[in-house]
């Protein structure tokens, strides 16, 4: 019986030696094999943490899009001619970027009971790219003398690429977590 107790103490001391000190809000993660329930709990923690951080980033970026879109709409009221058209295209581009960032859209609409219109993130991105090209064309051909306005009109293009990258990053994290679920091994702790 004493041998068994010594063996248990050695095992328990080994497991405490091989724990990794994580953040203060997370439990210690052992590098010893995890049983299936512990694996599922760990994957659930990863999934929850990824979901929370994705929501935080998406909400912060959405606020940024709305604030900058509001600024562009204020500038639209004060401007004329080609600048007004470019600013309107930039504001609409920000709206499209915000929609594709926040939502996964696939809808079919019937127009006049004959035509079927499919609206998806891909089609919204195509419209967004057309708006960005229009805005860039106007800004480089007609607003060349005012560098501040040209720079102001390039921000929606930058925010479009930020939305694309954040969406891709979130999708990659989801794929990695799905791959992690496939890598679970069967281990029962006696």
UniProtKB/Swiss-Prot annotation:
Residues 77-80, 145-149 are extracellular. The keyword RNA-binding does not apply. It comes from the Eukaryota. Keywords: Membrane, Transmembrane, Transmembrane helix. It is a multi-pass membrane protein. The chain crosses the membrane at residues 56-76, 81-101, 124-144, 150-170. InterPro entries: UCP010056. It is found in: Membrane. Residues 1-55, 102-123, 171-190 are cytoplasmic. The keyword Transmembrane applies. Present with 238 molecules/cell in log phase SD medium. This is Uncharacterized membrane protein YGR016W. It comes from Saccharomyces cerevisiae (strain ATCC 204508 / S288c).
């Amino acid at each position: 019986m004493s041998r068994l107790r010594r063996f248990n103490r050695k095992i328990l001391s080994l497991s405490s030696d091989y724990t990794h000190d994580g953040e203060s809000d997370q439990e210690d993660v052992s590098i010893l094999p995890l049983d299936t329930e512990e694996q599922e709990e760990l994957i659930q923690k990863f999934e929850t943490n990824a979901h929370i951080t994705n929501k935080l980033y998406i909400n912060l970026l959405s606020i940024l899009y709305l604030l900058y879109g509001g600024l562009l709409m204020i500038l639209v009221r004060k401007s004329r001619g080609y600048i007004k058209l470019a600013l309107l295209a930039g504001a609409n581009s920000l709206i499209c970027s915000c929609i594709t960032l926040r939502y996964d859209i696939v809808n079919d609409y019937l127009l006049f009971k004959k035509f079927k219109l499919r609206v998806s993130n891909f089609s919204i991105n195509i419209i967004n790219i057309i708006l960005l090209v229009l805005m860039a064309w106007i800004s480089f051909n007609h607003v060349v003398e005012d560098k501040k306005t040209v720079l102001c009109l390039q921000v929606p293009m930058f925010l479009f690429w930020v939305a694309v990258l954040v969406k891709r990053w979130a999708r990659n994290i989801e794929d990695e977590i799905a791959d992690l679920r496939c890598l679970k091994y069967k281990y029962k702790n006696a």
